Amino acid sequence: MEIFRKTVCIASLIAFFVLAAGFNAMGAQYPVGSGNDDWWTTYPDQSSGAGGEVNQPSWVLDALKSKPVLIYVHKSCDYCKPQTEAIEKIASEFDGKITFYEISAEGSDARAEEALQAYDPNGGVMYVPLTVMVTLAPNSEGTVEPVWHSTEDVTGEDWIKNYLEDAISQYDENSADWDN
């Protein structure tokens, strides 16, 4: 009988840890940090300005008061076309859940330059298409602040969707604690 009780106890503990790990995985998919796939509070490791403060544009911070932000800066070139198509599909799917800015880099919209300056993941020469997600998450001290992730690559729908789903999850979890 004693062996049976120990076996049940051990099995219960194992089940608890498996369930706890599963619940933990349901939260944010990407951590806050400085790595290539992280949400960033400062310029990431691969940037020439690594660790430097980000000058968040006021129009992004204003939009962030109500929901996560997707910014897409591009030209009407062949290289940008696949990302533009992916962004358009995803933006309609997430309509109402995010604030979406599609900004031409070929016009006179000052927001294009502001976004490129603020959110270029590599520093140096800025390229398009630039895809940026901005949300809210706790920094290393636990204070909720704007975090971002961006790329100048053509990523496709899955990559964009994964980051937007995570942005929404982070936002829902942390927006009430943001002292804007």
Each language-model region and where it sits:
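N-terminal targeting signals for export/organelle localization
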Residues: 1-50, 166, 170-180
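A short beta-strand-turn-helix
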Residues: 46-69
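Thiol-based oxidoreductase modules, predominantly thioredoxin-like and allied folds used
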Residues: 51-53, 72-73, 95-113
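Typically the conserved alpha-helix immediately C-terminal to a functionally engaged Cys/Sec
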Residues: 58-60, 81-94
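Loop/turn elements at helix/coil->beta-strand transitions in domains of secreted/extracellular proteins
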Residues: 65-70, 95-101, 127-129, 170-174
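Short pre-active-site segment immediately N-terminal to redox-active cysteine/selenocysteine motifs
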Residues: 73-79
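Stable alpha-helical elements in mature extracytoplasmic
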Residues: 79, 83-86, 112-115, 156, ...
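Non-catalytic, surface beta->alpha helical segment in thiol-disulfide oxidoreductase systems
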Residues: 126-180
